[in-house]
């Protein structure tokens, strides 16, 4: 009797981030389910999509979520690059009722410009930085700390996530765990 529906609107991802298992595990990005299939009369949904913004089907489902008035949490995070590079997406997301935060990822300094642009686009659409939550992948502690401090200075909510590979060969360092606990 969980108060929120849980499910995937899409599966897969268009990106091939070297640290991510999603493309290997789920394959190419594709539609998976209609929000009404698992909302089942509830008003809240925790959505586990990995790159819903890169999918036409996913964007249609977000429009439907808005029409239904459902509150959502894209728990795996949204791709800030999609928001930065497609201005209408920021406007679309500004009309969503969020359960708590709009979640995104800031996994490396390579996406710094896109992250900053996504934050600015969302702010222009009326979203407050305090409602913007960012997963921060921790591989190199100093680099992750710089990204955390940058997000904090922008008024956003960073969440440090120590990296571990899927073969078990790489485990987070003690410093990475300390950073995560501190953050």
Give the location of each predicted region.
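Alpha-helical protein-protein interaction elements
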Residues: 11, 66, 98, 173-174
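Anion (oxyanion) recognition and catalysis
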Residues: 66, 123, 149-152
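Auxiliary Fe-S-binding modules of radical SAM enzymes
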Residues: 137-183
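Glycine-rich beta-alpha loop elements in corrinoid/cobalamin-binding modules
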Residues: 1-6
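Local cysteine-cluster metal-coordination motifs and their immediate loop/turn environment
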Residues: 8-23
């Amino acid at each position: 009797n969980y108060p929120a529906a849980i499910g995937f609107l899409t599966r897969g991802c268009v990106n091939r981030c070297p640290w991510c298992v999603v493309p290997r595990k789920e394959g190419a990005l594709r539609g998976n389910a209609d929000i009404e299939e698992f909302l089942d009369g509830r008003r809240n949904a925790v959505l586990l999509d990995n790159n819903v913004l890169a999918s036409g089907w996913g964007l249609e489902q977000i429009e439907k979520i808005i029409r239904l008035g459902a509150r959502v949490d894209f728990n795996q995070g949204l791709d800030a690059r999609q928001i930065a590079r497609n201005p209408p997406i920021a406007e679309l997301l500004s009309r969503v009722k969020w359960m708590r935060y709009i979640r995104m990822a800031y996994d490396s300094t390579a996406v710094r410009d896109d992250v900053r642009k996504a934050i600015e686009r969302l702010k222009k659409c009326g979203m407050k930085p305090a409602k913007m939550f960012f997963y921060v992948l921790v591989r190199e502690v100093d680099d992750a700390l710089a990204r955390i401090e940058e997000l904090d200075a922008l008024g956003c909510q960073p969440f440090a996530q120590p990296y571990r590979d899927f073969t078990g060969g790489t485990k987070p360092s003690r410093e990475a765990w300390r950073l995560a606990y501190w953050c």
